[in-house]
Amino acid sequence: MSKNVPEGWEIRTSEAIYERLRVPRVHDRTTVNVAGKFPVIDQSENSQIGFLEVEPDFVCDEDNPIVTFANHTCAVRKMKIPFGVIQNVFPLKSRQDTDINFIFQILKEGIEPEGYKGHYPKLRETEFLIPPLPEQKKIASILTSVDDVIENTRKQIDKLQDLKKATMNELLTKGIGHTDFKDSELGRIPKSWEVVELRENLTFISYGFTNPMPESKSGNLMVTAKDVNNGVIDYENARKTTSEAFEELLTDKSRPKIGDVLLTKDGTLGRLAVVDKEGICINQSVAVLRPNEKISSMFLFNMLSSPYYQKTMLDNAGGSTIKHIYITVVDKMKVVKPPLDEQDAITTVLSKINVQFDIVCRKLSQTQSLKKSLMQDLLTGKVRVKVN
């Protein structure tokens, strides 16, 4: 740790700022209930293995929380309700001259996990900059208020995701304004709709290059499965190849066109995005689907993003240990085909939800960046807070 200690602050090891509580009993899945009053938390940041009906091991509340540290994952949690723990989850409480909410914030930035191993010995030796107690409380209050915004924004995102899934299911089975329905291989659908194999809606389906491509600081973007997420292609972080390699080493199957739909077939399966930039290429982890005149790009994207088709693709994925989506299977998948005008109407409805979703996601990203900046300033004393 840097020896640049702000005036009035001091350097302490972690165990000088908190007390590790004795765990009266360690739980596992055989000692907990599926439901109950008190969670038994695991080594993640937000889940539990089950519940206790009576006699929690640790009592806390909103005004007197307890912080926990997970030995293997380094996950830090602030518990505000009574709870129990599994093995290797260590409950901590503040000492007399430290604030528990401040401890939570500095431990969140304490150490990075180095694989699945015990990290508490390293935490015990870690040194932290500690301001006077009133300043701790003020810093913790500022950071906690930002945490609250982040948590509420995540809840908004969850609600919008649920709304989108429900709306997709409604629109892709009942359409808009229909009164006449018929039975089909995919259940009841509007009478004017068809059920076809996916390939009947495409002029082309393939996947990208398999041989290594030279990398360059400038040139054409190489999109892989990790660059496709939440309906967006992450051009900013995609690697690049030289213009010469793009032209000479690749065929058209690796060079998608604007309006093509990308589908991740390896890694995290089933993520989709519509190509909106020329001059990019894809590797073998990404499939390209080129719609014909019978289906719009955005309808194809929305349809394949819906819960039913996502589940179908994942259920049909092959491979023993590592799963893959095979285009020879996907292209035979049965899909609905509404008339083009109704495809556009469905896309319009879903686009409005997508716009809301994008706005909230940007807010989350901006707030997380703000939190990171505040922590760098406030937890180092670079920016001092005024204490009343």
Per-segment meaning from a language model:
Residues M1-G8, P131-T179, D183-L186, V336-N388:
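Amphipathic alpha-helical coiled-coil/heptad-repeat segments
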Residues M1-R25, G36-N46, L133, D180-Y207, ...:
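Non-catalytic DNA-recognition/assembly elements of restriction-modification systems
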Residues E7, F83-F90, F104, E112-P134, ...:
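A short glycine-rich beta-alpha junction/loop motif
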Residues T13-N64, K80-Q87, R199-P212, K226-I258:
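Sequence-specific dsDNA recognition surfaces
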Residues Q43, S145, L263-T264, K352:
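A generic structural signal for residues embedded in beta-strands
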Residues L269-D276:
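Short, Lys/Arg- and Gly-enriched loop/turn segments at beta-strand edges
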